[in-house]
């Protein structure tokens, strides 16, 4: 699957052996959740960026029955999914909308997930060629007292993390 095929929805749908009608968005569910932090990070986050605990979860259902999910931090990514964007997306083709950055990060992520699943293609292939076999993960926190940072580093090591990042 090449990028030109992704941009040309008709050839993309044909390439995946799917009817464009199976990519029609029939439902969008949104939920806002308050994410808990462990005690030490919570003290630091409450001091600096308390709004980071709020996230939006979005589930998109396509006419073919495929569901895609996406998530985004309400105050960190490029936008929350508005009621207007939900109304705009319902009834439209997910492959045509998935590149629309105005829809909100969580909805856009859910569209990529649904289109990828509909075509039995990993979502990363919709963005281009795979570059790596694995993705390194870091344990992270914002600045905090030395005692708390030591506790966090020990927890990260115990859980197998090889990198610790502080913001």
Regions from the PLM with identified roles:
Residues 44, 96-98, 136-139:
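A short, structure-level motif marking secondary-structure boundaries and short turns
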Residues 10-29, 116-117, 121-134:
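N-terminal amphipathic alpha-helix/helix-capping segment at the start of soluble metabolic enzymes
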Residues 22, 27-29, 59-122:
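Metal- or metallocofactor-binding catalytic centers and their adjacent structured scaffolds
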Residues 128, 132-167:
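Metal-dependent enolase-superfamily TIM-barrel catalytic cores that perform enediolate-based chemistry
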């Amino acid at each position: 699957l090449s990028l030109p095929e992704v941009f040309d929805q008709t050839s993309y749908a044909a390439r995946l052996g799917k009817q464009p009608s199976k990519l029609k968005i029939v439902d969008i569910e949104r939920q806002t959740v308050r994410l808990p932090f462990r005690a030490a990070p919570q003290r630091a986050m409450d001091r600096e960026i308390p709004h980071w605990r709020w996230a939006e979860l979005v589930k998109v259902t396509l006419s073919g029955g495929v569901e895609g999910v996406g998530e985004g931090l309400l105050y960190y990514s490029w936008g929350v999914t508005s009621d207007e964007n939900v109304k705009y997306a319902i009834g439209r083709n997910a492959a045509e909308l998935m590149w629309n950055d105005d829809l909100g990060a969580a909805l856009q992520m859910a569209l990529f997930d649904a289109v990828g699943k509909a075509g039995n293609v990993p979502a990363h292939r919709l963005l281009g060629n795979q570059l790596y076999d694995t993705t390194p993960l870091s344990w992270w926190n914002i600045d905090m007292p030395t005692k708390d940072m030591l506790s966090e580093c020990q927890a990260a090591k115990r859980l197998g993390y090889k990198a610790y990042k502080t913001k």
